[in-house]
């Protein structure tokens, strides 16, 4: 009897054990599971480093990097470098999420060193190690964390297509996005999460401790094999011993729940304060802008001159063509006037004294003079016609809203030039006839 009870108890215990095991499995991996745990890829992630005795076989360390007390120390001493690369490439299809947990201890302040996280084409690694101990010529994404830029400690995103190497001296000007990030000499590690979703209109989002650093939909990674890694160097400034340490790295085949956290508390951005002083009242006004908005307000003298040239061109575009035609007409009339005046001067100076022996009558002489100088006498009529046409043109231009202060000014100057010429012509014509009359009287006498 006791044996039967013992056997029943053993069977029941086994049944309960199996049920409990299945319940645990179902809870951890339910049917059709879409949780973050099901998306975690152990082949592309770091295992628990606390219990690890050596660097996993699917990862490769370089330079001074080493596993120490549950973390991988990339830079363990002054002027040191370190790297950690995944040996196998990741075949990108549509989306992924990767998280790096790291910290920096041992130094705080400006330094020419930094730590870079890489997601680059497989063919670009590890050809060179000139950019923060990483490739200077790569095709993919680089996330740089350093404290050598103009805005202090920042996280910056860099993109390159592998066509030309990245210039380290211009890396801050070529960043497509960035955010402030206080990371130095902190006992609390920071987590950088990179999410890319091809199906969500090429969404690329970078988060720091669940806060959005930046995001964009203007970046698209082509399909292919990519290498994942991290490199660091602590630089030579002040011979610092800044230690960059990796605690955790997880890679997910898809977008996880934490990637969808709304940006309620945005990360801090640098602020620039500009003081404006009113010259008339002397009042001061402070305007606060982000560094990126302030850069948009800057304009060089060359750009200012180009803008002024465009404005001047638009002002003159409405009337310059018609005005040029009128000016050409005026110049033509002036040339004809000078030609006639030259002819008159020559005739008056070269004509011999007349006598009455030829039997020329006074009426015939006057008629002959009028015939010789009919072109000269018609100049006044032509000038009057030009002035009338110019006045009509000005009135028509005013009606069409095309006339401006410049046309009036030019017309006024032309009148100043033409009126003295007309007066001179009339005076010369008067004295010419007087001389002619005196000559006729002399003949009669």
Swiss-Prot record:
Could you tell me which Pfam families the record lists for this protein?
Lectin_leg-like
Q: Where in the cell is it found?
A: Golgi apparatus membrane; Endoplasmic reticulum membrane
Which GO BP terms sit in this record?
A: endoplasmic reticulum to Golgi vesicle-mediated transport
List GO molecular-function terms, semicolon-separated: carbohydrate derivative binding; D-mannose binding
In the UniProt record, which is one GO cellular component term?
Answer: endoplasmic reticulum-Golgi intermediate compartment
**Domain L-type lectin-like, chain residue ranges per copy:** 36-254
Question: Topological domain, Lumenal: which ranges?
Answer: 29-412
> Per its UniProt record, what InterPro entries does this chain match?
ConA-like_dom_sf, Emp46/Emp47, EMP46/EMP47_N, Intracellular_Lectin-GPT, Lectin_leg
Name the membrane topology term. Single-pass type I membrane protein
Signal peptide boundaries: 1-28
Keyword annotations for this protein?
A: Disulfide bond, Endoplasmic reticulum, Golgi apparatus, Lectin, Membrane, Signal, Transmembrane, Transmembrane helix
Instruction: Place the motif Di-lysine motif on the sequence.
Output: 441-445
Disulfide bond sites:
179-213
Q: What broad class describes the main subcellular location of this protein?
A: Golgi
Which stretches does the entry tag as region Mediates the interactions with COPI and COPII coat complexes?
430-433
Q: Which family does it belong to?
A: Belongs to the EMP46/EMP47 family.
What is known about what this protein does?
A: Involved in the secretion of glycoproteins and in nucleus architecture and gene silencing. Required for the endoplasmic reticulum exit of EMP46.
In its miscellaneous comment, the UniProt entry states: Present with 2900 molecules/cell in log phase SD medium.
Q: How does it assemble?
A: Homooligomers. Interacts with EMP46 in the endoplasmic reticulum membrane. Interacts with the coatomer proteins COP1, SEC21 and SEC23.
Please identify the protein, giving its name as recorded. Answer: Protein EMP47
The gene it comes from is EMP47
């Amino acid at each position: 009897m006791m044996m039967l009870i013992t056997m029943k108890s053993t069977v029941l215990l086994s049944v309960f054990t199996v049920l409990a095991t299945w319940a645990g499995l179902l809870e951890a991996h339910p049917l059709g599971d879409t949780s973050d745990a099901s998306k975690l890829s152990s082949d592309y992630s770091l295992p628990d480093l606390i219990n690890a005795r050596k660097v996993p076989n699917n990862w490769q360390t370089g330079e001074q990097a080493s596993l120490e007390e549950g973390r991988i120390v990339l830079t363990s001493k002054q002027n040191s470098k370190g790297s950690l690369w995944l040996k196998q490439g990741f075949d990108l299809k549509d989306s992924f999420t990767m998280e790096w947990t790291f910290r920096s201890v041992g130094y705080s302040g400006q330094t020419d060193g930094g730590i870079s996280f890489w997601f680059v084409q497989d063919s670009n690694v590890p050809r060179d190690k000139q950019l923060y101990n990483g490739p200077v010529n790569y095709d993919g994404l680089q996330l740089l964390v350093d404290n050598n830029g103009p805005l202090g400690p920042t996280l910056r995103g860099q993109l390159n297509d592998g066509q030309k190497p990245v210039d380290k001296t211009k890396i801050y000007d070529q960043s497509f996005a960035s955010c402030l990030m206080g990371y130095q000499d902190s006992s609390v590690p920071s987590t950088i999460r990179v999410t890319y979703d091809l199906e969500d209109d090429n969404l690329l989002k970078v988060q720091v401790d669940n806060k959005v650093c930046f995001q964009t939909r203007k970046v698209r990674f082509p399909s292919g094999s990519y290498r994942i890694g991290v490199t660091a160097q602590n630089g030579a400034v002040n011979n610092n011993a800044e230690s960059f340490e990796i605690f955790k790295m997880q890679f997910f085949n898809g977008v996880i729940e934490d990637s969808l956290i709304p940006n309620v508390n945005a990360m801090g951005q640098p602020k620039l304060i500009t003081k404006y002083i009113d010259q008339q009242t002397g009042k001061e006004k402070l305007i606060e802008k982000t560094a990126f908005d302030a850069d948009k307000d800057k304009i060089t003298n060359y750009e200012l001159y180009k803008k002024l040239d465009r404005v001047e061109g638009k002002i003159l575009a409405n009337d310059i063509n018609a005005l040029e035609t009128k000016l050409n007409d005026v110049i033509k009339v002036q040339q004809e006037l000078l030609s006639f005046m030259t002819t008159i001067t020559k005739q008056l100076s070269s004509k011999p004294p007349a006598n009455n022996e030829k039997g020329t009558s006074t009426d015939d002489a006057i008629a002959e003079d009028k015939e010789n100088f009919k072109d000269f006498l018609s100049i006044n009529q032509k000038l009057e016609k030009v002035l009338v046409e110019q006045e009509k043109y000005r009135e028509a231009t005013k009606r069409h809203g095309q006339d401006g202060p410049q046309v009036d000014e030019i017309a006024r100057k032309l009148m100043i030039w033409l009126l003295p010429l007309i007066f001179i012509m009339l005076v010369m014509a008067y004295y010419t006839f007087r001389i002619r009359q005196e000559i006729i009287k002399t003949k009669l006498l």
